[in-house]
Each structure stands twice: as structure tokens, then as C-alpha cells.
A protein has these predicted regions:
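A short interface-forming secondary-structure element
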Residues: 72, 76-93
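Short edge beta-strands and adjacent turn/loop segments
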Residues: 44, 52-79, 121-123
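Extended, positively charged loop/linker patches that create polyanion-binding surfaces
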Residues: 81, 102-104, 121
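Terminal low-complexity, intrinsically disordered regions
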Residues: 1-37, 42-45, 51-53
Length: 125
């Protein structure tokens, strides 16, 4: 998902002595890290490119995350794998809240929408 998104910079501050921009990849990494903090999330789900990157031992912290800037706000689409036995509605709600909270707190950007797709269920190891 992350590789599909167009690289964008979000302007968060035009006041003062210069402009502050945040890259879309930074927002995607924040979203991925926040989602992984939720109990019951096993891993992020990605496309085939992300899977190959993982097999090569490279770490892709924005795997399974797509970030889109629309009218001064940020929309996040995120794909996760959950652990068998956990409540999917509860996990997805917590992911939505955690992702929105972390992006807004760390960047000052407004996040009106966090879409979560459960791509798989894995057993706990």
C-alpha cells in the first residue's frame, strides 16, 4: 500500500521564519507504529512488494498504510493481521483511535478518517 501512494509533503506551519512540511512517509510510519501498539494486532498487511522487502530483511515501517491528503486533512487506510481469539471490532476501533491520536499529536494534522482493513488472522506464536 505504501508504495502505491504518491509522495506528498504536508505543510503544517507557514508562520514564523519558514515553512514546516511533513512527508507522507512520515505520517505512514506513525500510523504503522501506532497500529502495532494495539493489543491483538499481529502485524501489518502489505502488498507483494512489501512482502518481498520483508523477506530481504529490510524493515518497512509503513507497510500496509496508505495516506492521502484531502482538503487540508489526512485520510489513512491501514491493513492489519489480527491474532486469533481477539475481538475484531474491538481491535479495529482501538487501531482507529490510536492512529488518529498519534498522527494528530505528533504532527498537528487533522485526521477525520482512519479506514482499517483486516487482511488476515494469525495464531499467536
Amino acid at each position: 500500500m505504501s508504495n502505491e501512494q504518491e509522495k506528498q509533503d504536508y505543510v503544517v506551519d507557514k508562520k514564523g521564519i519558514g515553512e514546516v512540511k511533513i512527508a507522507s512517509d512520515v505520517v505512514a510510519v506513525i500510523a504503522g507504529l501506532a497500529a502495532n501498539e494495539v493489543d491483538g494486532v499481529d502485524s501489518m498487511a502489505g502488498n507483494i512488494t512489501n512482502e518481498l522487502i520483508g523477506m530481504l530483511g529490510m524493515k518497512n515501517l509503513s507497510k500496509g498504510v496508505k495516506v492521502v491528503m484531502e482538503e487540508g486533512t489526512v485520510r489513512v487506510d491501514i491493513a492489519i493481521n489480527v491474532i486469533y481469539g481477539y475481538s475484531i471490532p474491538k481491535i479495529t476501533k482501538q487501531v482507529q483511535e490510536k492512529v488518529r491520536q498519534q498522527i494528530e499529536n505528533m504532527t498537528g494534522l487533522i485526521v477525520p478518517e482512519v479506514n482499517v482493513r483486516v487482511a488476515g488472522v494469525n495464531t499467536a506464536d
